[in-house]
Amino acid sequence: SISTQLKQFMDRTEGLLRYGTSQYQYGLQDKVGGCLAVGGNRNAGEELTILEIQAFFQVHDMLVVGSGGEPTPGCYHGGACTTYPQKGDVRDAILQDEIGLKSARNLGIRVAKTLNMLK
């Protein structure tokens, strides 16, 4: 699931919603959003976390982008990396997750392509 800090951020964006009173009302509308998640094991909840973030994007009328349909094991909703079976530094473990990094790269490419289509 999403972290407490991310949930807190999401809750504080109420002023950006359609019924908000902020000068930034609709501030996230039509923005492109792609999701990344890191978990302790492959397919151990990263997909559900990404879906929660995508639901937030949809509430704000954002354009949700996934990592594409390229045939690869991993997550198609966004970028999903794992730290398993590495112990120690999370960054080093993620850098060894070739499948997760591929899904994250695919997501970045798809976000860039979507932005180019909107120009």
Name each model-derived stretch:
Residues 1-73:
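Helix-loop-strand module that forms the ligand-binding subsite of alpha/beta enzymes
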Residues 63-119:
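Glycine-rich phosphate/pyrophosphate-binding loop and the adjoining helix
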